[in-house]
Amino acid sequence: MNERSTPQALTGPVIRAERLGKTYSEGKLLTQVFDGLDLQVMRGETVAIVGASGAGKSTLLHLLGGLDVPTAGEVYVAGQRMSALSDGDRGRLRNKTLGFIYQFHHLLPEFTALENVMMPVLLSGQSVCSGQMRAQMLLEAVELGHRLNYKPSELSGGERQRAAVARALANSPDCVLGDEPTGNLDNRTASTVFELMLELNRAQRTSLVLVTHDRGLARCLDRVLELYQGGLRELTSAEV
């Protein structure tokens, strides 16, 4: 795993899960995904979550991001208990505090790269001018300054994912949650996008929580956690 130190100077966790449980029901069949799961992600920290297919990695990410509701336990984001918030307040906190990157870029096809990256800024109530400036700066940071007015269909796969990274950072979030963000890319492009995320983490002190099946990428992060039998355990360097 990465030898750089976890940022002790930055106080408090940006995300905290306490005794988290999640159970799905289909008729009389109950499927328990988590039971009593605990997790803390400190500000500026990078964390990989690994585990077998079907272990619940994506479900955990959705719970941490307030996109799904736990059956038991609590999730705190930026110190706020998610279950105590209304749907509207939870959405506003999510838009302000968290960024999301998925295996598929989820860019809106009818809008340009610039317009896609602007959207979280506009949704937070800022002006179009502020949104344009922020989006252009981020797209230049991900080396897409020459593609501002290109629509997703006019971008390569790697360019689309870099635009998705820029969009995730549009509101300067405390934490970015990534669900296999390089999973659909070839090895070279995946490495480029991953290095970009780490550079932005270092520059902006944005926490990263990445679900990945790639142990090589996981080793580059501060901590690697394995989701196994409904709980999390931290892996040593030798185990990754």
Curated annotation (Swiss-Prot):
Keywords: ATP-binding, Cell inner membrane, Cell membrane, Membrane, Nucleotide-binding, Translocase, Transport. GO terms for cellular component: plasma membrane. It is an enzyme of class 7 (translocase). It holds the Pfam family ABC_tran. Residues 15-240 form the ABC transporter domain. ATP binds at G51, A52, S53, G54, A55, G56, K57, S58. One of its GO terms (biological process) is protein localization to outer membrane. SUPFAM superfamilies: P-loop containing nucleoside triphosphate hydrolases. Its main location: membrane. InterPro entries: AAA+_ATPase, ABC_transporter-like_ATP-bd, ABC_transporter-like_CS, ABC_transpr_LolD-like, LolD_lipo_ATP-bd, MacB-like_ATP-bd, P-loop_NTPase. One of its GO terms (molecular function) is ATP binding. It is a peripheral membrane protein. Its EC number is 7.6.2.-. It is found in: Cell inner membrane. PANTHER family: IMPORT ATP-BINDING PROTEIN, LIPOPROTEIN-RELEASING SYSTEM ATP-BINDING PROTEIN LOLD. Belongs to the ABC transporter superfamily. Lipoprotein translocase (TC 3.A.1.125) family. Part of the ABC transporter complex LolCDE involved in the translocation of mature outer membrane-directed lipoproteins, from the inner membrane to the periplasmic chaperone, LolA. Responsible for the formation of the LolA-lipoprotein complex in an ATP-dependent manner. The complex is composed of two ATP-binding proteins (LolD) and two transmembrane proteins (LolC and LolE). This is Lipoprotein-releasing system ATP-binding protein LolD.
